[in-house]
Amino acid sequence: MLNEPVSGSISNYLTTTHHAAVIYGEGVSFYYVEPPEKESLTYLGLLVFVLLNQAWFMGALFLVAGYFTPGSYERRGAGAFLKGRLLRLGVPLIVWVFVLNPLASIGLYLEPVPRIPGSLTWEAYPHLLGLGPLWFVALLLIFDAGYAAWRMLPQQRTPTPPRPPSQPTYASIVLFILGLTLSSYLLRIIVPIGQPVNLMLPFLSFPSLAYFPQYLSFFVVGMVAYRRNWLQTMPGSMGIVGVVAAVVAFVLLFPLAFFGGLGGQFLGGGHWQSAVYALWDSIMAVGLCLGMITLFRRFLNGSGGVGQFLAQHSYMVYLIHSLVLVGLAVALRDIELANMFKFGLIVGIGVPLCFVVAAIIRRVPLVARFV
């Protein structure tokens, strides 16, 4: 079955490396960035890495979250489930928006080419509020609340026992990919990839709602997988097929989506390149998740002392990794190194440092109750 400690620590590694690549490669959408070395192999490599990560790993997080949701609800009941979600998701979210996000945003003033002119003053505080990477926590809280509301409907109040073990069919997987491709393509006509969407308040900005069909559908698939024991019964060959499909899609569809250059047609707006890109990232997401499930089940199903340590601190790592990365990037700012070397340093130092800092913070009284 899916191993929560291992999946949590690996997802944190991917999140941290993803944002480190944004700092030195993409150059636009983080708290601190350095001018990318455009027209270089470093720029191209980090850009491809960011796009590959974006295509699947947040969907994988929602899949894992969905898998563990029904069992948690049935063990605790509606009231305790919602209270637990508000404490574990809502409280850290509030602290992030009003305290930690403004601290991380100081990096905007420390960039080699600052995006915000002038000096940092208290008048800037309202403009530094935001969800940042905690958009995932906010959206997960919405999904959990929606699941609880659905379970409290009269016809859903009786606990649903797990069904006899079954496994998904290749036909159902292909239909799912096609449905995900179509819904993603249609949404991206209105909300292209990279366009933030504000909900009610300016600081409630979701940066990647273009992937909403993937996030919601993977959360639901995770719950279905729990009910039908898919993670125990899915054949290992299905994981291999998934990875092969992802590789083939990367070789054939990924370059095709950029036909005509990097002008942005692949991001959305109804262009045919956007349809190709939606098909590519749907195949990537499904294929790599199938491979991840079978890999974890076969090789990474244990949870020894190291696994328990990673599990205990993985959520705190997710909360603080942006601050750690900004601090390290600022410390390396004036050192004459190529961006790829700085990327390697910040990942090599940043990932273990995040866990050390997380372990220290969680020793503060009451903190471990929430994270």
Give short role names for the model-derived ranges:
Residues 1-371:
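Alpha-helical transmembrane segments and their immediate juxtamembrane cytosolic regions
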